């Protein structure tokens, strides 16, 4: 079923026979010698527990964002072990060991911007909030845990 990306013409989820569809962008990881698209189970489970249908989306082109959003009732930008590339907010990479996911950066920043423009609900966690901030022109501290009185909040996968 094709849904309208325009919130004014998109039928509400309760008017359809299906659950709300939430896009969950995947991370890009190497498992051994092979590239994979992955999403944390805790995020997929949380979407289901909220009564929605999660759809893990592999990397997409910026030209596919509107089409994806036309099918979605919401977007969940998840946390990740990777960071938004500092070059995307006008800084050089301070630490070459910084885990980056340039493929995710390429399409989740336009996805966040467009979802907000269209009024598609967007929920962001950790890296996802950083993506949203950068997509809207904000900047980040590359190593916030190194600032006084700041701790790393990373949890086990």
Regions found by a protein language model. Name each.
Residues 1-123, 133-141, 145-157:
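N-terminal beta1-alpha1 cap of cysteine-dependent amidohydrolase-like domains
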Residues 126:
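Conserved G/P- and acidic residue-centered "switch" motifs that form tight phosphate/ATP-binding loops
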Residues 129:
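The feature captures the ABC ATPase H-loop/switch
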């Amino acid at each position: 079923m094709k849904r309208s990306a325009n919130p004014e013409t998109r039928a509400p989820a309760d008017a359809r026979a299906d659950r709300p569809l939430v896009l969950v962008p995947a991370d890009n990881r190497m498992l051994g010698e092979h590239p994979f698209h992955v999403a944390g189970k805790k995020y997929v489970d949380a979407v289901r527990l909220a009564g929605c249908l999660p759809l893990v989306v592999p990397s997409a082109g910026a030209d596919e964002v509107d089409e994806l959003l036309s099918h979605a009732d919401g977007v969940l930008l998840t946390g990740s072990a990777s960071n938004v590339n500092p070059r995307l907010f006008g800084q050089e990479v301070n630490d070459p060991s910084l885990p980056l996911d340039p493929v995710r950066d390429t399409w989740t920043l336009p996805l966040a911007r467009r979802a907000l423009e269209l009024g598609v609900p967007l929920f962001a966690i950790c890296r996802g909030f950083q993506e949203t901030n950068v997509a809207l022109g904000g900047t980040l501290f590359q190593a916030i845990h190194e600032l006084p009185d700041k701790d790393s909040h990373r949890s086990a996968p």
